[in-house]
Amino acid sequence: MVISVATPRRSIRDAVLGGVLGAGGRQLYQPLRCAFYDGAAGGGLTAALSEDGAEGGVPLPCGRKTAAAKNVLILMSDTGGGHRASAEALRDAFRLEFGDAYQVFVRDLGKEYGGWPLNDMERSYKFMIRHVRLWKVAFHGTSPRWVHGMYLAALAYFYANEVVAGIMRYNPDIIISVHPLMQHIPLWVLKWQSLHPKVPFVTVITDLNTCHPTWFHHGVTRCYCPSAEVAKRALLRGLEPSQIRVYGLPIRPSFCRAVLDKDELRKELDMDPDLPAVLLMGGGEGMGPVEETARALSDELYDRRRRRPVGQIVVICGRNQVLRSTLQSSRWNVPVKIRGFEKQMEKWMGACDCIITKAGPGTIAEALIRGLPIILNDFIPGQEVGNVPYVVDNGAGVFSKDPREAARQVARWFTTHTNELRRYSLNALKLAQPEAVFDIVKDIHKLQQQPATVTRIPYSLTSSFSYSI
């Protein structure tokens, strides 16, 4: 089965130029039409699919449905590990809650269907993160509405046709964005095709506090915020209260519903059963002062007067093989476990008593679920800056960029300040939202069940594209 999509390139370019460079985006445009489908009929995306198709149409092998299954298309990009992790958490929650009622596709439309720079965002992001000043300029420089509006309009001008093909391939009944740049063009495509009344489009924000303004689009059916702070930002950006829900950051079900026993875990992981343990992480890429902090911990967790350790260390090096090799060849004063990229972090977190990590939202949310006091030792400028006060102000941890001071804090918690460690642990558990991913998919299911969900997309390309220059 194929459908034939009328080529939108010229019409889309005309509309983008009209919306951005003239008339302030106030013109009304006729929707593009799929063959065998009248967009004005309001039949939704499913109704746009035909049993037959003209030659040269777009094949739809991925979007075929079982008898009553609904297709969910989750849009993401591998700019950092958090977006994919949230997307896969949502996918797994749909399967657990609704079984075969939904087919879930996790896709990077930019990489699969777009050209530069959409298909190169992962490499570009990693380069800028290694040069944090460059990333800081990029983050704040694109925050003004007119700047990112022009940028997104240019992307729509060149790649909207490809986005149409990508969306149509998966025949979605629901579209979920877990990335700030995976909203504007797809939303406008839905509006252009007259499909927005039947296809709920929701955003799941994956930053705990400070968010780039491109996260907040007026046209979404629902905006799921991980915290009250993010919800306030959404309101300031013009979203309606009816569009906003605060459930927490989606964490994979295998983590948030795992029932773990610390003693059993330490036995399984070959750890000392009697010594308190600190988990040291640098994210998936092993970034930050991991080596310096590990060596400081080795010194501070060794009682030289009694000649015995007062704690043990678990270091997660991620994909950083150089770091892992360096640490494995080192001598230590205390028991140390050196690990690479781990897929079962629930076990290592469950076996430890506190964590030292950079301020990544996913790691913070997981640590809170496990009740681990957090020492934040680094952050990415822009989106991770606000995660520090989120943890510190809620009494779930402390911040220190000095490896030696972080190690001393752990030593105090493990010896003379055990009550403080317990207090931080209780505060972490209070701040945790382990059911967030299930609350989100249940709410999306309710949206899909409604007879006529309307995404509030303006007739201009998007709210970000409408400017007079």
From Swiss-Prot:
Domain of life: Eukaryota
InterPro entries per the UniProt record, alphabetical: Diacylglyc_glucosyltr_N, Glyco_trans_28_C, Glycosyltransf_28_UgtP
Residues of the transit peptide: 1-42
Keywords: Chloroplast, Glycosyltransferase, Membrane, Plastid, Transferase, Transit peptide
Record's GO cellular component terms: chloroplast membrane
Localization terms from the record: Plastid, Chloroplast membrane
CDD domains on file: GT28_Beta-DGS-like (cd17507)
MF GO annotations: 1,2-diacylglycerol 3-beta-galactosyltransferase activity
Reactions listed under catalytic activity: a 1,2-diacyl-sn-glycerol + UDP-alpha-D-galactose = a 1,2-diacyl-3-O-(beta-D-galactosyl)-sn-glycerol + UDP + H(+)
EC number: 2.4.1.46
GO annotation, biological process: glycolipid biosynthetic process
Family recorded in the similarity comment: Belongs to the glycosyltransferase 28 family.
Role noted for this protein: Involved in the synthesis of the major structural component of photosynthetic membranes.
Protein name (record): Probable monogalactosyldiacylglycerol synthase 2, chloroplastic
Native organism: Oryza sativa subsp. japonica (Rice)
